[in-house]
């Protein structure tokens, strides 16, 4: 038996390291420390055919062409960690168990899961797994699975479109940032707060409890378009607006508490970025905004009516205020930059260790943009406020509305069996629009309105009905009670249909809301141009509410002088509807239900309970509106502009408090550079520029201000939405499909 030691296996430790000849993909090599060019042959990376003289040389191993492969992380602490597709594997095993073939179908190179990332993996796993399961169904599995696969591909195409729309940045790093940016940059066009006083609703600037986002000791974050009103032991106090969604209890009372929150946010964002879990942190940050409950530190109410009557504002004052407040970009940047040296000392000695940690970490990483963002964020929440001016003085001007007496015809009201109509001697139903019927409307000089009080006695005020609540419903089966008359604003008309022209006296007016005259046709809709001379002449009035249909409702007069109406289905504002106590709303009934707008519930000429559309035959159809005042109106319905006149029942002595104001959804015309013309004792739900609040005139009921002065404070402060955006940016949130 040999005593020689057993030969050891060669490893890296017991092998002498000698310089090896290094070969390059192009054919060159290093021999003795000298690089030798390739002998001959094609370009880089292609092996040339040896010549005959070279055949005897040993054949070397061809080096593979180097490829740029994507680095995929294999551990949680590295970026690019792939999400585990447990749902996908589970669907695969479930399909294998259910499959009559015992095999799993293949998607090939077009598998949507190959292109999905992050949240898209979850969506595509569900859609593709569902398609796999459908393919395993016996007999019908092939067609059903094909349809399911097509749907999965469609979902993938939709996800790709969302990714493209949210930005084509590498890795889709800023998709959630851009989506959050779009969600908080836009301010609602109509952010009017509504208060419920058990008997009715009315508009106010006071924030409701649902509008309060977060409460601090001396500051409040709230939704735009309102001002917090606090009831402090019986004393009502309006807080001071600092930004459209930040209010403070007193000037300068803001910075300390908000700085603490920003300190924690910077610390959390830095940790998320360091651990490469920005995706999860960003999703948690966004979702937490919907579930975190703010501590109740104050007793907020809606009894102050803050900033409703702030006084008259001239055009010069508006221009000066715009220069001070609407162009603060350069001033804000300079103010932030000037505070950076001071912040360096204050951050260290003030104990803002979260900010210090974030600055140190991102500085070592070379992320100077994030360092600047942190400094600007801290500079924003640490800035002070300063007073720049006071309120403009109140001015009083007289009523400038033009009162139109309307037409004064030889018309009398006749009561027949409890129903009111005009006298037949005033009618000339055979006249057309170009003859005496139209001319007599304006030039006959006398109207006997002695029967109007009795005629209008069956009409009720809006306050006489019960308040509404819940979801609106349409009443398609309208049955009119005995006390309901078509000349009352609350009269719910029956659905429009086909009306025989023989029974109609004069033209038929329909409202889009602009008044239009409907001509006679046959039942197939072919115009006849005979104005009811033939038995087959009819008015085709059936239509749906605009913008899907032609008009809201129609009004005409029959041959005996009675007013007839038809219209779209009115709105039922309560589920427990009672015909005696409740209202079927055919107009804008805002004070009884905030959702009842004219566009949703309008069923005729009545724009509000006080105002109806003015048209040439208004005094024939509604003779008791002879003393109504005429106002100019501009409305947009389905993108189409309507300019019309409205006749309103309002006089100087009528009460007009906030709870008495109706809503008129219109695009008001201008009285001046700062004043809108609205219907009397109403308001437009378009808030004022710069404040987002309602500003009404103290004494004149048909004026609303289009521009409101801010509470005389210039502010340099970051909104809470921007704090969330900076957190997403600092944490590298990438939540895209």
UniProtKB/Swiss-Prot annotation:
Residues 2-58 are annotated as: Interaction with EIF2AK2/PKR. This is Genome polyprotein. Residues 112-152 are annotated as: Important for endoplasmic reticulum and mitochondrial localization. Residues 385-411 are annotated as: HVR1. Residues 2-75 are annotated as: Disordered. Residues 32-47 have a biased composition (Low complexity). Residues 482-495 are annotated as: CD81-binding 1. It holds the Pfam family HCV_NS1. The keyword Transmembrane applies. Residues 265-296 are annotated as: Important for fusion. Residues 2-23 are annotated as: Interaction with STAT1. InterPro entries: HCV_Core_C (IPR002521), HCV_core_chain_A (IPR044896), HCV_core_N (IPR002522), HCV_Env (IPR002519), HCV_NS1 (IPR002531). Residues 2-168 are cytoplasmic. Residues 164-167 are annotated as: Important for lipid droplets localization. The keyword Methyltransferase does not apply. The modification Phosphoserine is found at residues 53, 99, 116. It comes from the Viruses. Residues 2-59 are annotated as: Interaction with DDX3X. It comes from Hepatitis C virus (isolate HC-J7).
């Amino acid at each position: 038996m040999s005593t020689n030691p057993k030969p050891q296996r060669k490893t890296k430790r017991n092998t002498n390291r000698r310089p090896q000849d290094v070969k390059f993909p192009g054919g060159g090599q290093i021999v003795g420390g000298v690089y030798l060019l390739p002998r001959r042959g094609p370009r880089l990376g292609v092996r040339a055919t040896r010549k005959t003289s070279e055949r005897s040389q040993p054949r070397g191993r061809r080096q593979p062409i180097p490829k740029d492969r994507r680095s995929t992380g294999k551990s949680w602490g590295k970026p690019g960690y792939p999400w585990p597709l447990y749902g996908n594997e589970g669907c695969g095993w479930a399909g294998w168990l259910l499959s009559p073939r015992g095999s799993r179908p293949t998607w090939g190179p077009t598998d949507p899961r190959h292109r999905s990332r992050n949240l898209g993996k979850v969506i595509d796993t569900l859609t593709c797994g569902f398609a796999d399961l459908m393919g395993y169904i016996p007999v019908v599995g092939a067609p059903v699975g094909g349809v399911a696969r097509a749907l999965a591909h469609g979902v993938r195409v939709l996800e790709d479109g969302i990714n493209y729309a949210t930005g084509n940045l590498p890795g889709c790093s800023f998709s959630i940032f851009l989506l959050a940016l779009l969600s908080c940059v836009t301010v609602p066009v109509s952010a009017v707060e509504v208060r419920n006083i058990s008997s009715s609703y009315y508009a106010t600037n006071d924030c409701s409890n649902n509008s309060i986002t977060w409460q601090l000791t001396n500051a409040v974050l709230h939704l735009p378009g309102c001002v917090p009103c606090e009831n402090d032991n019986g004393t009502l106090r309006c807080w001071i607006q600092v930004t459209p969604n930040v209010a403070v209890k007193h000037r300068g009372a803001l910075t300390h508490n908000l700085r603490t929150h920003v300190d924690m946010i910077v610390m959390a964002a830095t940790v998320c970025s360091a651990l490469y879990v920005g995706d999860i942190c960003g999703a948690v940050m966004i979702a937490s905004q919907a579930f975190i409950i703010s501590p109740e530190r104050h007793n907020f109410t809606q009894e102050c009516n803050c900033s409703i009557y702030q006084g008259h504002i001239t055009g010069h004052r508006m221009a000066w205020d715009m220069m001070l407040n609407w162009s603060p970009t350069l001033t804000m940047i300079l103010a932030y930059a000037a505070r950076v040296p001071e912040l360096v000392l204050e951050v260290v000695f003030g104990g803002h260790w979260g900010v210090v940690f974030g600055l140190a970490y991102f500085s070592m990483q070379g992320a100077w943009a994030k360092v600047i963002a942190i400094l600007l964020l801290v500079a924003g929440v640490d800035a002070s406020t300063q007073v720049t001016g006071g309120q403009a003085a109140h001015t009083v001007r007289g009523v400038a509305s033009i009162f139109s007496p309307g037409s004064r015809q030889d018309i009398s009201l006749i009561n027949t069996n409890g129903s009111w109509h005009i006298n037949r001697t005033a009618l000339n139903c055979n006249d057309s629009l170009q003859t005496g019927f139209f001319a007599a409307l304006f030039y006959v000089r006398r109207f006997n309105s002695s029967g109007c009080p009795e005629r209008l006695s069956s009409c009720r005020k809006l306050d006489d009905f019960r308040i509404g609540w819940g979801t609106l419903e349409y009443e398609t089966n309208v049955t009119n009670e005995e006390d309901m008359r078509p000349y009352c604003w609350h009269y719910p008309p029956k659905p429009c249909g086909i009306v025989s022209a023989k029974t109609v006296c004069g033209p038929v007016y329909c409202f889009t809301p602009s008044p239009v005259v409907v001509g006679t046709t046959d039942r197939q809709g072919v115009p006849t141009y005979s104005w009811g001379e033939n038995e087959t002449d009819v008015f085709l009035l059936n239509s749906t509410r605009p913008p899907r249909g032609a008009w809201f409702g129609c009004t005409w007069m029959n041959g005996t002088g009675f007013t007839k109406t038809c219209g779209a289905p009115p709105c039922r504002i309560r589920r427990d509807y009672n015909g005696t106590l409740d209202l079927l709303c055919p107009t804008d009934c805002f004070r009884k239900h905030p959702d009842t707008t004219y566009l949703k519930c309008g069923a005729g000429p009545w724009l509000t309970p006080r105002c109806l559309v003015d048209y040439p035959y208004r005094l024939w159809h509604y003779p008791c509106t002879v003393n109504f005042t005429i106002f100019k109106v501009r409305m947009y319905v389905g993108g189409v502009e309507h300019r019309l006149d409205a006749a309103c029942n309002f006089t100087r002595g009528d009460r007009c408090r906030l709870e008495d104001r109706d809503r008129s959804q219109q695009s008001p015309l201008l009285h001046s550079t700062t004043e809108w013309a609205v219907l009397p004792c109403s308001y437009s739900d378009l808030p004022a520029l710069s404040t987002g609040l309602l500003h009404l005139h103290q004494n004149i009921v048909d004026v609303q201000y289009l521009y409101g002065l801010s509470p005389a404070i210039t502010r340099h402060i970051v909104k809470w939405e921007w704090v969330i955006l900076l957190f997403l940016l600092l944490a590298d949130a990438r939540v895209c499909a």
